[in-house]
Regions:
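Flexible loop and strand-edge segments within Gram-negative outer membrane beta-barrel domains
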Residues: 24, 207-228, 234-295, 301-319
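Membrane-embedded beta-barrel scaffold of Gram-negative outer-membrane proteins
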Residues: 294-308, 426, 434, 467-525
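Extracytoplasmic beta-strand/coil segments of soluble accessory domains associated
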Residues: 74-115
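Short acidic/polar hinge/loop motifs at secondary-structure boundaries
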Residues: 114-141, 229, 463
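N-terminal periplasmic "start-of-domain" segments of outer-membrane beta-barrel proteins
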Residues: 35-68, 96, 137
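N-terminal periplasmic accessory domains that precede
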Residues: 73-76, 95-98, 125-130, 139, ...
């Protein structure tokens, strides 16, 4: 036992030596929503399960995360048919989740049921959550619950970290791949008493060498070095529960032209220096154990600092966020649950940039465009207090209905109303039908959220009067549990429709000289249909097959044309197989993906008369595989990703002239790197 205290203290001292600490731990929600409960099954523990409440979604546990390298949150959905993770930019490595055919700005990101990763963190947040830190992920589709705010339009992704109160142990995870990337992770927790526990989480990663495998003179992916640390505490008494923690992150990304192939003093360089600090606390006062009556106060704060250079464009940011929520919840009986709460969210973005943008009139700056040589201050802020009420009716296992409303007041946009409704009906145990309808809103801090677009040679033109994004989402899903040959076939089919009333449109089509962001003038919608099935074919062998069809369109060119959303695949097919030997010593996992083609932005004519790029991109396949050998206190794994070796032929257009308007690295629709092999070891004691 004392060795664990010593190791935990050593890890804490090492973290303090690495850099100053503050932040990101989130606690697992003291009072989880009913929809976050999982269906329990017997036999080999499945890596995913359906959420048991009225909200449609899935829960992903560590068994699923172990099926791939899963170095961070962005690499945790390789085997998931519902969630796509795509690169937005070949030079910065910006990546976003796509859910229901729409980008991650419409997916509310939570860490242990606290809103997180806003503004400038959005393009890079998937790399801020190390995979070995995660205990599980819940993906809710549609408008989700009103408890956590109004921002969920296509869904919520909630990350649960390893907990201080988990079984005491020390874990170490080491990883390396053939692209010169190395990672080291460590975590340790100690039970200080029967009520108090603490843990330390450490992460370091480094890409030791840049690569230019396609010979275009630019690095295929940015160099990246990251330090990440969290310290978390928990107290669990009979009538009072506390969770709290601090965390800090430091990351440096470097990219641009390969200096070995460019003999010039005028090298195009990209540098992003990020410092992020977070802190949170949760207090739960249990008033009545029999009825689950409790009052809870939750609060989180973060500061995100970014110092960025994109060629001769510069962007500096100091972003601060404060969120607090006071909640009351009780079960009047086994059938009736009521949740009430108030919350406040405050965002402040202090920015400096030398780009052509038009800020909101509330900032008090002139409307005239800025010269490239001028650094301008662009300060934005919003405070949004609100209140919600949510009622849940449960009739045994047959029916669960949840209705919630929010009323919020934005210091920019005034009052707005958020209704949401979910129902689950099970006529028999083998069938579940879910319906949902709800509204969601997003405030757009365009320059922060789309700062990776500054790497383009085009000018970035942001409208000065962007409205709050506003959309309705409707969903229908059915789940079948079909007995077949002594086992159960799990079959799921779902359809979702998202319709925007207001949207910040990112337009590549209107003008070859600029990328424009402006208010929607016309229609914008997404239709998504998905069917998936899983079956334990043999003892220890689980297979999953899925197909998803997307129809995503938006009105571009300032209201002139309703077109397919660019860089969005029309469909996706996925097949996974996972086999674990009877004694559990060996595990074999494989995933095959077929990603459909889609539309590229409107091309234009180059000086030589040729088109800048093809009007459409084609479908492509990807294969990944991993073999794991399990031992009592450790495991070793080897694998490969993108084994088909497919790469987008031209991830950077105009690479030979990076200082011109033809330079375009942000039109990424496929892999930018070829085959990659990796190996790692996990040790716990």
């Amino acid at each position: 036992m004392y060795s664990r205290y010593i190791l935990t203290g050593a890890l804490l001292m090492l973290a303090l030596k690495g850099y100053s600490q503050t932040d990101t731990a989130s606690l697992d929600s003291v009072f989880k929503d009913e929809e976050l409960k999982e269906v329990k099954v017997v036999a080999r523990k499945p890596g995913t399960s359906r959420l048991a409440g009225a909200v449609n979604g899935i829960a992903v546990n560590k068994d699923e995360l172990f099926k791939a390298a899963c170095c961070n949150l962005g690499e945790s959905f390789t085997t998931n048919p519902s969630v796509d993770v795509a690169y937005n930019d070949a030079t910065t490595g910006a990546r976003q989740i796509k859910l229901l055919g729409l980008s991650g700005t419409y997916v509310q990101m939570l860490t242990e049921n606290l809103p997180n990763f806003r503004g400038a963190a959005i393009p890079y947040a998937l790399g801020y959550v190390p995979g070995p830190w995660m205990k599980g992920i819940q993906v809710s589709k549609g408008s989700a619950s009103v408890k956590n705010g109004y921002e969920s339009i296509t869904g919520q992704i909630n990350v649960d970290y390893l907990q201080p109160e988990d079984e005491q142990q020390v874990e170490v995870n080491l990883f390396g791949d053939t692209k010169s990337r190395i990672e080291a992770n460590a975590d340790a927790n100690v039970h200080l008493s029967d009520k108090w526990a603490t843990e330390i989480l450490l992460h370091h990663e480094n890409i030791l060498q840049n690569h230019d495998d396609n010979g275009d003179g630019f690095y295929d992916m940015p160099g990246r070095e990251q330090y990440n640390v969290q310290n978390r505490w928990v107290y669990k008494g009979k009538n009072y529960i506390f969770h709290g923690g601090l965390g800090a992150l430091k990351e440096i990304r470097t990219s641009g032209q390969d200096t070995e192939h460019v003999h010039s003093d005028d090298i195009y360089r990209i540098k992003l220096h990020t410092n992020r600090y977070e802190g949170y606390m949760k207090h739960a006062f249990i008033l009545n154990h029999e009825h689950g009556t409790n009052i809870a106060f939750m609060s989180s704060a973060s500061m995100h600092q970014l110092d960025a250079q994109y060629g001769n464009k510069f962007y500096d940011l100091n972003e601060k966020n404060l969120y607090s929520s006071l909640m009351f919840e009780t079960n009047f009986s086994t059938q009736h649950n009521l949740s009430l709460g108030v919350s406040v969210n405050h965002d402040y973005l202090g920015q400096r940039a030398n780009v052509n943008v038009s800020p909101r009139p509330t900032v008090g700056l002139e409307e005239s465009p800025y010269l490239l040589s001028d650094m301008q201050r662009i300060n934005e802020k919003e405070t949004t207090p609100g209140a919600y009420a949510q009622y849940t009716y449960t009739l045994g296992t047959k029916l669960t209905a949840m209705a919630g409303v929010r009323i919020d007041h934005s210091s920019i946009y005034g009052n707005f109303f958020t209704p949401r409704f979910h129902v689950k009906y099970s006529p028999i145990d083998a069938i579940s039908i879910r319906l949902s309808a709800g509204k969601g809103y997003c405030t757009v801090f365009a320059l922060a959220e789309y700062n990776y677009l500054l790497s383009s040679g085009r000018n970035l033109n942001i409208s000065k009067d962007l409205k709050q994004e506003e959309a309705w989402n409707y969903g229908l899903s059915t789940a079948f549990y079909i007995p077949m040959f002594g086992k159960t076939l799990k079959l799921n089919a779902e359809y979702y429709y998202t319709s925007f009333e207001n949207q910040a449109v990112v337009d590549y089509d209107a003008n070859k000289e600029l990328i424009a962001i402006y208010n929607l003038r016309g229609k914008s919608y997404s239709h998504t249909f998905q069917i998936d099935a899983s079956y334990p074919l043999l003892r220890g062998l689980e297979i999953t097959a899925a197909y998803r069809l997307n129809d995503v369109k938006c009105t571009y060119d300032y209201g002139k044309s309703l077109m397919e959303k660019p860089l969005t695949s029309k469909y996706k097919a996925l097949f996974t197989a996972s086999y674990k030997t009877p004694l559990g010593l060996w595990q074999f996992d494989a995933t095959v993906q077929l990603n459909g083609g889609g539309r590229n932005p409107e091309s234009y004519q180059l000086a030589d008369g040729s088109p800048s790029w093809s009007p459409r991109f084609h479908s492509f396949e990807q294969v990944s595989a991993q073999v794991t050998r399990w031992f009592r206190h450790w495991s070793i794994y080897v694998g490969g990703e993108n084994l088909t070796g497919f790469k987008q032929k031209t991830p950077i257009y105009g690479a030979s002239t990076p200082w011109g308007s033809d330079f375009e690295p942000t039109l990424v629709w496929g892999p930018v790197e070829g085959r990659m092999f990796y190996a790692g070891v996990r040790v716990h004691f």
